[in-house]
């Protein structure tokens, strides 16, 4: 009888131990807080930088590539678009357009993000992109609160937003 009780206690202890260890491994660890360089802003796992110095689309993207290997911002969701719009508005800029990383490199109306991200979310302004317009680079427009995209000539000079991993 003593062996049966000892065996029962041993099995019970092992079951309790395995249950408590299972609970420990299922506990979610908090996401580490992203740290971005001074003068930039964090959103999710990226850092963002708004530059008010006007550049052509190509020069703006090169600037972003030289800044922590980033690109002009790719706006992949509505929530990210709202974040970028708030970042621009907080700067109190007078600019009517701000470059983003969307462009049509082959001029065939097939738009791509300079970062290589897939274009799944779209936020074109009414009438954009327009085949009547010779614009193959996209900007955010102030008249939409910087939430809508418009195709523009890549040679125009606008301020811009960079996006990069730190």
Swiss-Prot record:
All O-linked glycans consist of Gal-GlcNAc-Gal-GalNAc tetrasaccharide core and get elongated (microheterogeneity). The keyword Disulfide bond applies. Residues 1-22 form the signal peptide. Pfam families: Lectin_C. Glycans are attached at residue 27. Disulfide bonds join 36-47, 64-162, 137-154. One of its GO terms (biological process) is response to peptide hormone. Might act as an inhibitor of spontaneous calcium carbonate precipitation. May be associated with neuronal sprouting in brain, and with brain and pancreas regeneration. This is Lithostathine-1-beta. It comes from Homo sapiens (Human). The gene is REG1B.
